[in-house]
Regions:
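Alpha-solenoid helical-repeat scaffolds
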Residues: 1-2, 8-16, 24-27, 42-44, ...
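Beta-propeller blade signature
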Residues: 2-12, 57-75, 113-126
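Extended, regular secondary-structure scaffolds
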Residues: 33, 37-44, 53-55, 62-73, ...
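Structural signature of eukaryotic scaffold interfaces centered on beta-propeller domains
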Residues: 1, 30-41, 91-99, 105-109, ...
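Signature of soluble extracytoplasmic/periplasmic domains of secreted precursors
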Residues: 104, 109-134, 163-181
Length: 181
């Protein structure tokens, strides 16, 4: 892949030819983020393991995420995965001097139990903070009303068919997740 960072004045900041050693059928890009200050480009992708593009194999998560950083000095990358949570979607968020991966997670594949957040060190690409926030009682009440059985089932099994649409960054750095059924 050829990465070229260009300023608004159309002058080139840098150009890097990068190679990602993956089989195309086993790797999918999730998102991209660009640092407005220095033109650093971050790529996030999902790499399926065991030569299979099935999300689970033998009841275990069968993929990991790969984060790539490309700048004027070259490229670097880091891999990460959650062994006990199924991350159904994940997107890069670059705001001010922060880099994060934000998404949805579940206890099983194809269900969603809450929102996950990984704060990433921009220099090393290592995860500094990993958080899993289950859906709040207020969210479940808004969705199901006072139907206790449905809320209990949602807490136990997760919600079906939730799709991450967008992430909005507030001025103070708070993140708002837009998702829908």
């Amino acid at each position: 892949y050829l990465i070229m960072a260009i300023l608004a004045s159309l002058s080139k900041v840098y150009e890097q030819l990068i190679q990602i050693n993956t089989k195309d059928k086993l790797f999918t890009y999730n998102s991209i983020a660009v640092d407005d200050e220095d033109g650093t480009v971050y790529f996030l992708g999902k790499y399926f393991e065991n030569n299979s593009n099935k999300p689970k194999k033998k009841r275990a998560v069968n993929f990991h995420f790969e984060l790539y950083k490309v700048d004027a000095n070259g490229q670097s990358n880091n891999r990460f995965k959650s062994s006990n949570k199924y991350i159904s979607s994940l997107a890069l968020v670059k705001y001010k001097n922060h880099l994060a991966c934000l998404g949805l997670y579940g206890k099983k594949d194809l269900t969603t139990s809450g929102v996950c957040l990984f704060n990433i060190n921009q220099k090393t690409l290592q995860i500094e903070i990993e958080k899993y926030n289950p859906f709040s009682e207020q969210f479940l009440t808004d969705k199901f009303g006072n139907k206790k059985k449905l809320k209990k089932r949602a807490v136990k099994n997760g919600l079906d068919n939730i799709t991450l649409n967008n992430i909005h960054v507030m001025e103070n750095g708070d993140l708002i997740v837009y998702a829908e059924e």
